[in-house]
Amino acid sequence: MQDFTGYHSEWNLGSPGGWDYQRITQIIGKAVWSALNTITPIGVDLDFDHPLLFPVNGFVKMLLEAHEVREGKNPGLIAVVAEEETLDDVTENINLALRLSSFDGITGVLMSPRQLELRNGRVCWRGQAVSIIFVDFNSDVLLGLHRKHDLRPLLQAVRQKRVINPRGTEPINVKSMFEVVGGVHRGRFHPEIVNRTPWTRQFHARRTVGPGGEEIDDLIEWTYRHWSELVLKPERGYSGKGVRVGVVNPDAREAIDLALREGSYIVQKKVPLGLWAEDNPILDQEQRRVVLERCQTDFRCMVGPGGLFGFLGRYGAVPTNVGSGGGVQPLAVLRSDMTIRDAVNRINEAVLGMNYGELTGVVRMQERLAVEHRFTYLLGPIKVALRPRVISVRQIQSLNDYGHALWSDCLMLEKMWLSGELDEIVKIEDEELEIARMQPWGGSPAIIASDGLFDFGASPEPS
């Protein structure tokens, strides 16, 4: 597992995305790479077509297999259920429904949860029975919508175990699970998962043990004194909302007051920014020149029952989430006989030496391709990096081992929750827990994401 260094910052067992966005990113990135090499041959051989760079393929395969387990070879409808206000804007959900419909006997439909109906106890859409449902929101959102709109058909689908991800993952879909993995129970989990888990504690007035094994009498006061080394995050947050990072957000009192006011936060040891940074070429439009910009990276691993579906590369500031203004980055497997660092340095130097006007044309092509593919998120067009993030075949093999260990350890967490061992740490309301108990996971079809702050060999060298 030392083929790459770093930590996972969080896991998503609810409804992780990015599986189709990376497919589009690869198409755009490969075209940009070809254009860059037309300007100046770079001399680095890269593979943009490795199967794990297209995670949607494994995800769709899992959905089709889940349908076949229930319905055999019979035709059927697979529903992609998302919040009503997102139906016209989230491109990958639109593409998923279209992709499912391209298979013989399968109809994929994107819909809001209110469009489901019950007919003689069967969950249907416009009178047609539904086989499998991918739900693109977590159970807290489901419960809130149910209170407004009466979503009994969707809850019936949960009871019938038609929903992916199973709602039984929700109690362990909280960032405080890192306290379990890295705490007194660490011996029950894979060493590589434990070693990649940053020190984490539920944030409230308490005594606990610090990152170095030191006794902490008052976690709140300790956090204030050590703020530059820490991060505060909502236990169930997404898109970077509510996150406060030491140094990046220097006002410790504001961060702590926010966490205490909102409640249900975790405090986490900050992963050094240099570990998960890379230098990327960008166009400085004011100076009309090409420059290197230091960006933070995020490497999402998406895992299913059989192992890795693939990856999503993101980059930007802190946090890197697309919902917080970050972008996506093409990924490429290195085929040349050189190190990752040498490959990235050669790419950066070549792009820095290119004519600004010619590169402007490449960026315009990149933007045109993004529009053609409706490459947008809720905030609008998604930024795409000019050069790919480079990884090796050996690193992919290690990431596959990491994915298997992650799946196994999440199953251990569910077993601990079902046995009552996590009752003191899982703090979600009773109605939501009832939904979780309707559909235990137990390793059934699901997509799990781990967001890695990893260094594959191209992080900035110490100056």
What residues fall within each predicted segment?
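Preference for protein termini
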Residues: 1-463
